[in-house]
Amino acid sequence: MTSLMFKEACSSSEVVAAQLKAEGARYAELGAALRAKPPQTVLTIARGSSDHAAAYVAYLIMARLGRIVASLPMSLVTLLNAPLHADNALAIAISQSGQSPDVIEPIRYFRKGGATTVAMVNDATSPLAQSAQWCMPLHAGAELSVAATKSYIASLAAGAQLAGHWENDANFLAALADLPEALAAATELDWSEAIDVLTPANNIMVVGRGISYPVALEAALKLKETSVIQAEAFSGAEIKHGPMALIDNGYPLMIFATRGPSQAGLIHLAEEMRGRGARVLLAAPADVAERNLTIPVAGTPDLDPIVAIQAFYMMAAKLSLARGLNPDKPRHLSKVTKTN
């Protein structure tokens, strides 16, 4: 059996290529507008996988543009009616469906208050798309599996487009143009070792740091959704502040060690946790001898997390089936979630 989750994840390369072609000029226009009037405040508005994509976007904006970004607790608007000042703010909403009130209402609130509002959304006819000043379609197409894959990767690519065009960095944008090729390569990798380790597992820690932490969050969510594994994501800087007390002999630990300043520390953490008895699955590029799982590299380290999660999705879809589950229809879940 080949799941819809697997098939949809495999199409991410084509999805990103379509988005780059269709929306590049629009992102260039948005980037020019942000350079002409730089926002004092940047907020992200999202739930679930989209919030993990928002964390990646926040990292890019802070690291590359020096703008402080915060994730909005949506209940401040939807439940508490807090008097938030929106003038000269940039509010970025990310959503697959564009249907959830707790994402729509803050965008409407901030737009009314004078903020620049951007909706990265798969359904360009949705209420969220209609509520934002800038609707930036993800071009992921219909996603039938409950587990979001191609729409998440499309959200990461959209965030990279926003940051790249805002910074107006030709080298970064050139690397982004080559991203579909790297995504295609990620679908061909052998992560069977992870399936062998996780098929009998009940729990796991998923670790990243810096630019790779958002995909650790996403991987942990997918392991919960599709394989019913109690998965928790941690920054490599936080795992020693309590969580490693859980480590005992054979405890699974997946570490995303993509290129960049955090990589050396994550490789060292993998070795330390092996010494404590953990069953470590170190996902890293081919030049890291200590790796268990290989991830391809993109044109720049800041895009590596996108190809890393693509490789993970291929494995996760197979793992769910190996555990006797249906990754397309996780129990208790539905494709569109509406919360206030």
What are these regions (language model features)?
Residues 35-181, 209, 256-302, 315:
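Glycine-rich phosphate-binding loops that contact phosphosugars or nucleotide phosphates
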Residues 2-3, 7-39, 134-252, 323-340:
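Active-site phosphate/pyrophosphate-binding segments
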Residues 251-259, 308-309:
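Hydrophobic membrane-spanning alpha-helices of multi-pass integral membrane proteins
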Residues 299-340:
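Generic C-terminus detector
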Residues 7-10, 126, 309:
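Alpha-helix N-cap/helix-start motif at coil-to-helix transitions, marked by capping-box chemistry
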